[in-house]
């Protein structure tokens, strides 16, 4: 096997892609900071049980596992940063009020999530802990859309769902609850024949409600239909009210309601939202409420957040990240060295051309030159 080959769905990030990723990372983290979010940097490697406190079987399957040579315990390479941030909030910060945290780092997946997806994503996200009200969900939803607009994306479609609807239906019917995982699979895949089979012997109200969910998809008017077709339960009424408020917030964004979109159901406890753009089949960003995520660390707090993959965002973003620079000669000249240092201190990129290498530089567009005129070094257009 060639020594330069990489594993399947693993790739190097070359300069043109890397500078775009870094430009987007800086833009998004700066925007998070403008909202009051503090950055944290969890480790790439943790004890497996710490990484798998939430997310169900899917997260376990996506997590690389290895043995710690020091302790003999099983370690995991993180597949999702959110549980780590929950651990930091619950165990290390231990604050009483609202905490806003953000992050950006690599995650590893044992299997790609799509045909051409990478197994090494760069996950960036933001989370609010400590507020159970819808105000936190509204802020996170707005921040997610703000981040996508910063990346130059337009014609965004926001899909909204709510884990509380299915949870309420299963809580009132023990027989349905026993088939919860199968019902979740059928609803997520919009597999109506399987859904009909699974609900055939359930109570009439539960059967009718579960069979209605795949058809409750469309614009915000679907919520009115849902109120007539679903049982009048406090949890369902509250979920539909939340979705109505979330749907009314975005401006200039297409909003769709999908009460059968349950991806992440095992993880979420309330509103769920996904952002799509034209020409991209999968969601570019996902978020939602997950109030139970800190429970395994001894301190469950209300929590809501969103995340996205920076590599995928860079692939579809029209943002131009190629910077301008000043091309300077290389010479052992004190005046030249002082001029170069002064320009760099002022924030300019100055590239000194090494002797015998006059090729065009790809990383930066050298639109100016540092030249000597009348004994002084000055910058001129190229």
From Swiss-Prot:
Pathway(s) annotated for this protein in UniProt = Amino-acid biosynthesis; L-histidine biosynthesis; L-histidine from 5-phospho-alpha-D-ribose 1-diphosphate: step 1/9
Q: Which Pfam families match?
A: tRNA-synt_His
Q: Which GO terms describe its biological process?
A: histidyl-tRNA aminoacylation; L-histidine biosynthetic process
Is Membrane among this UniProt entry's keywords? Answer: no
The alphabetized UniProt keywords are:
Amino-acid biosynthesis, Cytoplasm, Histidine biosynthesis
Instruction: Name the domain of life.
Output: Bacteria
Per UniProt, subcellular location reads as: Cytoplasm
One MF term from GO for this chain? Answer: histidine-tRNA ligase activity
InterPro entries per the record? aa-tRNA-synth_II/BPL/LPL, HisRS-like_core, HisRS/HisZ, HisZ
Anything else of interest in the record?
A: This function is generally fulfilled by the C-terminal part of HisG, which is missing in some bacteria such as this one.
> What is its quaternary makeup?
Heteromultimer composed of HisG and HisZ subunits.
**HAMAP family registered for this protein in UniProt:** HisZ
NCBIfam families according to UniProt: hisZ_biosyn_reg, PRK12292.1-1, PRK12421.1
The Swiss-Prot or TrEMBL record describes its family as follows: Belongs to the class-II aminoacyl-tRNA synthetase family. HisZ subfamily.
State the protein's name: ATP phosphoribosyltransferase regulatory subunit
> Source species, please?
Burkholderia cenocepacia (strain ATCC BAA-245 / DSM 16553 / LMG 16656 / NCTC 13227 / J2315 / CF5610) (Burkholderia cepacia (strain J2315))
